[in-house]
Amino acid sequence: MICFSGNRRGIDDRTGMNNCLKALKQIVPVAEKANVILNMELLNSKVDHHDYMCDRSPWGVELVKRVGSDNFKLLYDIYHMQIMEGDVIRTIRQDHAVFGHYHTGGNPGRNELDDTQELNYKAIARAIADVGFQGYMAHEFIPLRDPLTSLGEAVELCVV
């Protein structure tokens, strides 16, 4: 299940962290009882989601550690984190234990995973496989060409 941190609305990182913790301490026990994993999505606040709180991997990783439950993880959105911080493969290798789900999308533009964008998805998919990830990678992009063809190409690109 995907959840979100909400927007900053003028509050600092520490206050935002405490607000998220307060809410998650109430919600996560329900998820644990139902055997559901909550994945808080990392989004960029630079281009698409101005003011979003959980916009950097280190902030999200710290939140996961503070919540302290196997039923709370991060959704690592590769497109968004490329915009915010880059260094995608190193981050995946370093923090994979707290990533419960992945989203793809070409950057720039959030379009197809092709040679018009800056991310090497074959290498990224290999890194995700190398760390033993057994969950899902969802293709979340806006195709400029035929959607089914674009999806098929994205799936093929990420098979390692």
Task: Locate each region found by the language model.
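Histidine-acidic metal/acid-base catalytic patches
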Residues: 37, 54-76, 80-160
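Active-site acidic/histidine proton-transfer and metal-coordination neighborhood
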Residues: 1-73, 83
